């Protein structure tokens, strides 16, 4: 802080950033440093925001997991990678994924995703190239190989 009761410019910049969207602690610290604030000043602002309840990695991770699972865009390993990329600590990733209820059946979500992307896809009638294309699409979204095989067998 610059004065006894005056919030620092860094803290105010962090608050402005948080009005636009959620950040993890690491991402906000990085963003503040990109705006040319010193690392120590950015750290102090982040710590203050945590104390005041404006910044919580767990809340960020829970919201992201819920949103991703709701739209079914990706799952599994891809979801872990996305959380890691956004700066969520690894121990928190495991905890949030364990505690977060998976909406519905993963096989059904994969089936729905394939139907949306490849309308009329029939694994029994598809040639090898089509099967590889759909399998790659699902794998890039974090679906396991055994689940993809199961989807193709039905």
From Swiss-Prot:
Tagged with keyword Cytoplasm: yes
Subcellular location, record wording: Cytoplasm
Cellular component per GO, a single term: cytoplasm
Keyword annotations from UniProtKB, A to Z: Cytoplasm
Keyword Cytoplasm annotated: yes
Domain of life, per lineage: Bacteria
Gene Ontology biological process terms, A to Z: regulation of DNA repair
Function comment: Modulates RecA activity.
Protein family membership: Belongs to the RecX family.
Listed HAMAP family: RecX
Protein name per the record: Regulatory protein RecX
